[in-house]
A protein has these predicted regions:
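Long, charged low-complexity terminal regions
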Residues: 304-337
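Charge-dense, extended regions
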Residues: 328-367
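Short cysteine-rich clusters marking metal-coordination/redox-active sites
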Residues: 34-36, 89, 117, 159
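Positively charged n-region of N-terminal signal peptides that target proteins for export
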Residues: 1-7
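Local sequence-structure signature of Cys/Sec-based thiol-disulfide redox active-site neighborhoods
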Residues: 24-38
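Bacterial N-terminal signal peptides
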Residues: 8-18
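Primarily the internal scaffold of c-type cytochrome electron-transfer domains
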Residues: 43-77, 101-115, 123-313, 349, ...
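Long, well-ordered hydrophobic secondary-structure segments characteristic of membrane-embedded
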Residues: 69-101
Length: 367
């Protein structure tokens, strides 16, 4: 479930950019075309992707969410006959349900398979036969329709539409709030891929946060009477990224973004430039120190407690990803404070800013 604004974005990602007509666009071949034993459905590290997706990856079971009791309650509150067939739900939980039949190479549409291969990698008609050929470069495959998930900006955009914003009506009906975190969520996934580049870590975290702020800004700018569930997370996200203004001369500052309309393009520029940035351990260290020093703000009783709580939930995830690259002895030294910070940030109604400030100050002294 997502905002109606992002529904079109998700469909574009699924069907393929520039798809003006199904006949001219690459078509879907279906996950079975990827799952033969000689391809991604076999055994061993090079051929076990389908097995991992089917048995370990929650994306293969996203459709199941639509047929449980909670979804039935949400659908009833929204006066939707069936969550399993409504595009307000299937766009993210069963993407192929909303794709026209003409976009398929054969009768393979299986909404119940959830988020499958081509949902992320793009329609495979034009590249499936050539993507293993040694004389075809990665660029060649991308030109044929393979989504360039090696690029962090592209990767973030492929995920954020279904992992960040939810329309207010859905939230009011009981849909949980979403918080997009590209690096942490990617690391927590059962890996069906091999990595050779800088695709995880602080750089991925920053790109993901900038893309998340862009999406929240776009949603907020469209709402005539946005409630706290939209404004508070947006303000916390903007606050977090503003702490990194000036981290590198190639990155734009967000200090002047006074509202959602201004933050939207600024956040997108930040995401694009961060994805191209040559990241370093020094940048990680600087970002970590800047965010840790916000303990003085959490000690400020003039800042509303709920505002502090929203900041804290974003901050602890940032600290988690920025400390992940540290060596084991350094990370072990910080672990008690990190655990306490996470525990303190868990409950919005009971958030205690003064305790959070003390724990954050303790962590700051150990950096």
């Amino acid at each position: 479930m997502l905002t109606m604004r992002n529904l079109a974005t998700v469909l574009l990602l699924v069907v393929g950019a520039g798809a003006s007509a199904a006949a001219e666009s690459p078509r879907f071949t279906g996950s079975p075309s990827c799952a033969t034993s000689m391809c991604h459905g076999g055994a061993g590290e090079l051929r076990h992707q389908t097995t991992i997706w089917q048995k370990q990856d929650i994306h293969s079971r996203t459709y199941n969410t639509l047929v449980n009791a909670r979804s039935a309650q949400i659908a009833a509150a929204l006066k939707i006959p069936d969550a399993a067939t409504s595009s307000r739900c299937t766009t993210c939980h069963a993407p192929f349900h909303d794709v026209p039949k003409a976009a398929f190479l054969a009768e393979i549409t299986k909404p119940a398979e959830g988020v499958s291969c081509e949902s992320c990698h793009g329609p495979a008609e034009k590249w499936i036969r050539s993507h293993t050929r040694p004389d075809f470069s990665h660029r060649d495959r991308v030109l044929l329709g393979l989504r360039d998930l090696n690029h962090l900006y592209v990767r973030a955009n492929s995920c954020v539409a279904c992992h960040q914003t939810v329309e207010p009506a859905l939230l009011a009906a009981g849909h949980p709030e979403l918080l997009f975190e590209l690096d942490g969520q990617a690391v927590s996934q059962p890996k069906h891929w091999r990595e050779k580049g800088d695709w995880h870590g602080p750089k991925a975290w920053l790109v993901g946060q900038a893309v998340a702020l862009r999406e929240m800004s776009a949603q907020l700018a469209q709402e005539k009477t946005p409630g706290e569930k939209l404004t508070a997370p947006w303000a916390a996200s903007l606050w977090l990224l503003q702490k990194l203004d000036g981290l590198d001369s190639a990155l734009p500052a967000l200090k002047s973004a006074a509202n959602a309309s201004q933050a939207h393009p600024a956040a997108d520029t930040l995401a694009r430039r961060a994805a191209e940035l040559e990241w370093s351990h020094d940048l990680t260290r600087q970002a970590l120190q800047r965010l840790a020093k916000t303990h003085t703000e959490f000690a400020d009783a003039k800042i509303p407690r709920l505002q502090q709580a929203r900041r804290a939930e974003r901050l602890v995830l940032a600290l988690d990803r920025l400390t992940a690259p540290l060596d084991k002895p350094a990370l072990a030294k910080l672990e008690p404070d990190l655990k306490e910070l996470f525990a303190l940030a868990q409950s919005l109604p009971d958030f205690a800013p003064e305790k959070f400030a003390k724990s954050l100050e303790s962590l700051t002294k150990k950096l």
